[in-house]
Amino acid sequence: MSAVLDHDDHDHDDHHDHAPTGWRRWVYATNHKDIGTLYLLFSFTMLMVGGVLALLIRAELFQPGLQLVNPELFNQLTTMHGLIMVFGAIMPGFVGFANWMVPLQIGAADMAFARMNNFSFWLLIPAGLMIVGSFFMPGGAPAAGWTLYAPLTLQMGPSMDAGIFALHILGASSIMGSINIIVTILNMRAPGMTLMKMPMFCWTWLITAYLLIAVMPVLAGAITMTLTDRHFGTSFFNPGGGGDPVMYQHIFWFFGHPEVYIMILPAFGIISQVVPAFSRKRLFGYASMVYATSSIAILSFVVWAHHMFTVGMPVTGQLFFMYSTMLIAVPTAVKIFNWIATMWRGSMTFETPMLFAVGFIFVFTMGGFTGLILAMAPIDIQLQDTYYVVAHFHYVLVAGSLYGMFAGFYYWSPKWTGVMYNEARGKIHFWWSLIAFNVTFFPMHFLGLAGMPRRYADYPMQFADFNAIASVGAFAFGLAQVYFFFWIALPVMMGKGEKASQKPWEGAEGLEWEIPSPAPFHTFETPPKLNPAANRVID
């Protein structure tokens, strides 16, 4: 191996070459690996908090009638579950993956702006505390739904202001993280790594970062207008003063639809790394994958009103948004076709990362089909705000984003920790999660088709059976994640397990497998020399 990679063999006089110790290592962290770890820990913590809220929702809906919570608290639970999962669990989780893997995959020494990286993480802590703490404010947490539609938000208690402030902080954190990722990818690639030789995970994050910078200010604008309507006498969304609540929906969903692609594109990137590794083949159609990802990002800006077919829109508008939404299925199908083509006639083995990747493709595609169904305006007018919609977006967000993160964890954790996770337990986690997930959300399609509306604490008797099944599935799914934490994640974090080799996966390619396991504190301090495919370091 070249001198670039001999990290520990020679003496370093410089103080910064040794990892700082104790609490300072984490509080003052500027190393991309430490910050990535912090993001992932924060993300998992919020996943557990959001999960507890979800289980309270499902416990309430286990039977008709009011069991545990009153309707006001129920609406707080649904609102906060959505906000915490989207802004506290999924987004920081993928930023953690980006921090850890992007510099390793492009042969960079670190992220471009190390201190800004630290700042963008530590902003999450007060924001998270404020969101969770809003439950303890007068009047309870925000209860307007995670979309925070006016006019309800104009009548909420003081916790609404805390929620708005927290979202502003999270938005600032996301924008800083995105600037960091863009500058790192565009400026810090090792010589010889052109953009079209970059790993797919870096591509998806580059595109995601541009999306974040484009739409986070739009959310900030919407919630700032809500704030001024609440306290400063404006009437942006207040019909009494000549405002329009529907305008809020337009502004929010212009942010909200690109946002759901922000949450899925990094998962696409992880799947595009895992599938070739366990098929022992190059990714099929690399260029088309890049163009498909870009197409998804561009199209995501012209589909927002499909969330609003029922608010009163000219038929021309409905047709435009219906067709543009159906069009986005084309690049998505290109990606799914390419993953299947990558597996075609490959020497496949099914270790846990591959199981999650195949599970992702299968269940995410089901979510995509229900999305295609909801894209059709006449059908959506029937199904809007029913449990069919809940089923659809949990199929793409849980079986999409969350499974993508699990695949990434199992794939890269040997590089992070230096030890292998327990393969048998990983497989248990996969099957348990997959079955429990489908038991939870599949019946919701039937509930929605039968007309059960979302966001109600009580429901008529005819919906009882499927709700009971869904609640049992939800508790099983939650238990599977507790199992994952205590029996899979904790042991590897504590360094228990078989020692991981430099490249534990036979078919894996890329610069992250050219450094020792666990990854040294400093990597690629001098830019590595790469082979023509830019996936190996040469002497």
Which residues does each PLM region occupy?
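Membrane-embedded and interfacial regions of multi-pass energy-transducing membrane proteins
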Residues: 2-539
